[in-house]
């Protein structure tokens, strides 16, 4: 699920089993394609959340720049049982107030973020394999 307000984009995921500790490797990655262009970013994703997780309430947000993931800021998150919420600053990832459209994907325990085959081979993804969720708000 995704939602937004003036300041943040919010993401929620619910898993079948309790979510593992944030200290696990390759834990609960949130991949965001802000420009909805598969030809930009890493495998089309412009931002990744949770590539490095310093605490049980704060995580990192990284952007794909010069063929590498670069830290650009932090995001708040909470885990309770099998649910996880993340709040990402719109300003941090370039989500303008006038337009709210992006693609996103969750990936847990994939081994190589640069290999698209990982989405079908290792770990779990939502949605499956190379599919993305699309979030779009119609402006009135």
What are these regions (language model features)?
Residues 24, 80, 129-131:
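A short, structural micro-pattern
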Residues 97-99, 128:
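Solvent-exposed, conformationally flexible loop/turn segments
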Residues 11-13, 59-63, 82-88:
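Generic recognition of long tandem-repeat/solenoid scaffolds
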Residues 78-97:
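Localized edge beta-strand/strand-to-loop motifs within extracellular or lumenal beta-rich domains
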Residues 52-81:
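Glycine-aromatic-enriched beta-strand/loop faces of beta-sandwich-type recognition domains
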Residues 1-58, 100-103, 107-122:
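Surface-exposed, glycine/proline- and aromatic-rich loop segments on solvent-exposed faces
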Residues 116-140:
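Short beta-strand elements
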């Amino acid at each position: 699920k995704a939602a937004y307000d003036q300041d943040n984009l919010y993401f929620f995921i619910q898993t079948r089993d309790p979510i593992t500790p944030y200290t696990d490797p390759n834990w609960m990655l949130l991949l965001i394609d802000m420009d909805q262009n598969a030809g930009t970013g890493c495998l089309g994703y412009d931002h990744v959340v949770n590539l490095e997780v310093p605490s049980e309430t704060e995580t990192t947000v990284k952007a794909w720049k010069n063929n590498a993931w670069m830290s650009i800021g932090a995001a708040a998150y909470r885990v309770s049982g099998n649910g996880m919420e993340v709040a990402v600053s719109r300003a941090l990832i370039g989500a303008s107030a006038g337009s709210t459209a992006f693609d996103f994907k969750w990936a847990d325990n994939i081994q190589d973020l640069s290999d698209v085959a990982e989405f079908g081979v290792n770990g779990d993804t939502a949605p499956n394999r190379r599919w993305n969720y699309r979030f779009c708000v119609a402006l009135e």
